[in-house]
Curated annotation (Swiss-Prot):
Alpha-D-glucose 1-phosphate binds at Y107, G173, E188, K189, S206. This is Glucose-1-phosphate adenylyltransferase. It comes from Shewanella sp. (strain ANA-3). Disulfide bonds: none annotated. Its EC number is 2.7.7.27. The keyword Nucleotide-binding applies.
Amino acid sequence: MSNVRYISNLTRETYALILAGGRGSRLHELTDWRAKPALYFGGKFRIIDFPLSNCINSGIRRVGVVTQYKSHSLIRHVMRGWGHFKKELGESVEILPASQRYSENWYQGTADAVFQNIDIIRHELPKYVMVLSGDHVYRMDYAGLLAAHAESGADMTVSCLEVPVAEAAGAFGVMEVDDEMRILGFEEKPKHPKHSPGNPEKCLASMGNYVFNTEFLFEQLKKDAQNANSDRDFGKDIIPSIIEKHKVFAYPFKSAFPNEQAYWRDVGTLDSFWQANMELLSPTPALNLYDAKWPIWTYQEQLPPAKFVFDDDDRRGMAVDSIISGGCIISGATVRRSVLFNEVRVCSYSVVEDSVVLPDVVVLRHCKIKNAIIDRGCIIPEGTVIGYNHDHDRAKGFRVSEKGITLVTRDMLGLPVGYE
């Protein structure tokens, strides 16, 4: 009981700041009109729901969501789905858009995004500040990270995980640690990462999740703001500048529950986004969206159930090994190994296989779609074939990824585009 009370005290003394202003340029047209944290995932969620749910499930009830790039749909989603907290009980989820609070510049980097909200953080009087990445899909108990930070007496703690060296190159901050997990070296997105001791194929990568003692954080941010040569970034500037003179520790990422594999996915490319959604179709997926012990919260639209109609030999409404969300109608069509978000219509004689179909898509009759990502609001013309011939897909103006996933957006179909 004392340990539970100790963790509860730590989480009550913490303010979490989720950095959700990134574009996600490697997702190409999929993020032309939305920030990456606003991107859909798993049939009914958005990426931002995962770090927010981690906060709530970890007992952290004071959260700020920092927004910048094309944030309309993100702000709307957070307001609709996360506005039920009671300020009088010390609970809040606040949206913190770039507003030139300390200069005429917008957020210039991850550190600057926190620096420009120092007054808001200070008003909350936290003992600890947790800075979290808002653009990964993962399940993590932040209370364990907080406890490790407090017990080590660290000034800063960086959450980390082992990734393949080839995957980390140019993509992740990479660190060197001693036997006590104190960080001895840190390099942001190196072309040639240093491998982990005894494992030449793996390296220790930063997850972009940090815990700071509040006053220490403020001191470092103010110093960084006065450095004309700084990129205003935690990985490039703050961490390398403090590891020699201050106590900065690494915290190995682990599952929220014993005997379960930890889940973390970088969905920053079309291929990784498609693959992470496809993994959910397994009978026992690594990310269990049905786990009542660690629910993923989101905005719940009032939608009717999914419906499957027609049972003729040549026109049978059916779905196999798929996730079909509320409001969908499969009308005499076949869906296999696919994720359909809310209010998708698949009309007669069409076949959708191995695809991720975002909300409000209409697939008209006699279409064949496989290995595709169909963006929100697309209307697929009758008889369209997608994913069977990449040269034909490119000729139609669709994008084909490195691993052969075809992306279709409204703009590619000549439909009106803009905020969702």
